[in-house]
Amino acid sequence: MNHRLRYKVLSDEDVHFFVRAIGAENVAQTVVKKEKKKKKKKKKNEEETYTPDDNNDDGNGEDEILLKDMNADWQKKYFGKSKCALFPRTSEEVSKILRYCHENHIAVCPQGGNTGLVGGAVPVFDEVILSLKRMNSVLSIDDVTGVCVCEAGVVLEELDDALMRRGMCMPLDLGAKGKCQIGGNVSTNAGGLRLIKYGSLRGTVLGLEVVLADGTVLSSLLRENRKDNTGYDLKQLFIGAEGTLGVVTKIAIIAPRAPEARIVTIFACNTFQNVVELMVEMKRRLAENLSAVEFFDRESLKLTVETLPGAKDPFPYDEDAGCNEDILRTKIQFYVAMETTVNEKAMESRLRANLLNFARSVVIGDTRRSRGNFVRILPKFRNDDMRKRGKKIAQRFMISVNNKHANELWNLRERIPVALKYAGAVYKYDVSLPTIKMYELVERMRERFAVRGMDEEVKVLGYGHLGDGNLHLNISRKKGPCKDTLAVIEPFVYDYVTEHKGSVSAEHGLGAMKVQELWRGKDAEEVRLMQRVKNMFDPRGILNPHKMIPSSPSLTPSKL
């Protein structure tokens, strides 16, 4: 249905209601014209109304700047036209806002830290932006049960810091942790770097408080029990729903004990087959301590080293190191970053010894201590010597020697998205595939650009969460966006994923970018069922419209 026919255009009356409901200081808008003039002193018991200087002394100027920022995603790829952003401080205020919007057919776009990559947190048209950033309190941390209850606007890194002070940690780690909010993480079912150890948010979230489209506050879902086998687990409907069924306002989540020691190891491999074999060995022999397994290709490392200050290639070629020149001439193509942890500091030395033994068994050559780091050295071996030493699936490795060094090594993977911000126009795809097929998509994409003579202007990078089959495919074009570039990528990337029974969205969600691609992974009956659920929770469709449910003539209300 046409957006303008279905939803009301925001009026002065609507803005005045929002001001009365949550206070002028919590409303940013460009609907009501504000003029610079002296603010009148409010009389006792006088009802609050919108006056020109309630937010600033320059009319709507500051609000315009704020709204411009909130109407765009961080990639500056998706843009909305909202003229009003609301900043409630309590669930009750969220309830007032949604009840009014429901009654008046006003579309709403919930927004957290706005770090998403598919346009899910910015308006498609002129929806009112509902920001949760001022609902940012950690309400309780239970030292006995390990359960943390907090509001949706708490920044992930700040929540993790609060837990660390109590000897616990968040079971979720993201590159955007310094800005993303836990409510947005839950609403997108964010995966992150340590899913292999702690599992997804569907398993670690115990309870939610959610405000429905009509203003109903579902506080009864905010349970802290690890076991509850009574009825349907309704909270699961809101995890990953991208704010289309209700607005998450509070979360109860399991906080595991924080590890006391962390060691990062980087391996270098020549083929992706070696990468997969290495991961299998890691899971088989180090499962108890394994907390993350990531991979990135040579193009990703090259971009990071060339772009970000302080980033260094962990394995620079050294002709004077006495290494086998034949091996050095074989370019390393892949890197595997492995994070291992132990809960007791006293166990760190044993873990380090285990890692060294593991590396010796999978990497060509011997190990020696060099310049304070455990570094892989490549002496000459005859073929029969290699056979005696067993199967070798990596070329080099480096083990971190302290926390600072661990962070430096881990940042080689974690900061790739930051480096990509300086690479021009970037086309990002977050997909899940059978592990053995992950990198084939990257290679096929490079071939498609090469046969069209576009491989010089376009770079294709591949990295991701090796432990759960999640590939981040990135195509960058220094000269900016181009229709010809997009035509090479789509729909091929989605066709490939569908052909290999993967998912077009592994962890980023559908947002505005992939909503129509939902048809690729689900049949019509499944999508119709999703639409029925949407209609039940949000019959007027005011919550994050044009997201999650694809448009199709077969999904009109009369056919549901």
Protein language model annotation of sequence segments:
Residues 1-40, 45-99, 116-146, 175, ...:
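N-terminal flexible segment immediately upstream of the FAD-binding catalytic core
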Residues 24, 498-510, 535, 539-543:
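Alpha-helix capping/hinge segments and adjacent helical runs
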Residues 28-35, 46-53, 57-68, 267-268, ...:
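C-terminal substrate-recognition/cap domain of FAD-linked oxidoreductases
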Residues 137-294, 543, 559:
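FAD-binding subdomain of flavoenzyme oxidoreductases
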Residues 216, 514-560:
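Activity-critical C-terminal alpha-helical subdomain
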